[in-house]
């Protein structure tokens, strides 16, 4: 009887953890749905970053286009100097997130897909990382913890505006998860994340202290 009781308690705990995971996903989906219904899909940031990358691929300095030193390209559009501008290397690395070689409509589909695929891949890798290093013992808790990449409400805003922040954060998390297996891959992911150095730069210091030279 005691064994049966213990099994039932364990079963109930698993059901509770599974319910927590499903509830968490439901809250995140509802939050995104609320923004979509009441605010709509803007993708303003995505368009701006795409324009900058596209001009660079056409051999033009986006800052020259912004300040009307060179004429804009009709198929790309004019750049607003009050909104545009980022770190110089992001005009090249940014093509991974906002590919300037694609038409704008195709880029919109691409970044929306990336906004969902990147967190899912990150959650999978993070869950495996947590289990492998025994930060958690239960797979349901590992799933719940890894799904925290969807937790900030700003993730929904990043989707609506096509902002790079959510994808950049995923790159940072992935780089830390794969560091032990491949410093080169970790470094490449961190390089893409440097499109937003205010997010990624701080992670170079622990890599430096741990002497992960390849990643740096």
Regions found by a protein language model. Name each.
Residues 7-9, 201-216:
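Perimembrane helix-loop-helix junctions
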Residues 130, 139-155:
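Transmembrane and membrane-interface helices of multi-pass
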Residues 16-131:
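TM-lumen/periplasm interface segments of multi-pass membrane proteins
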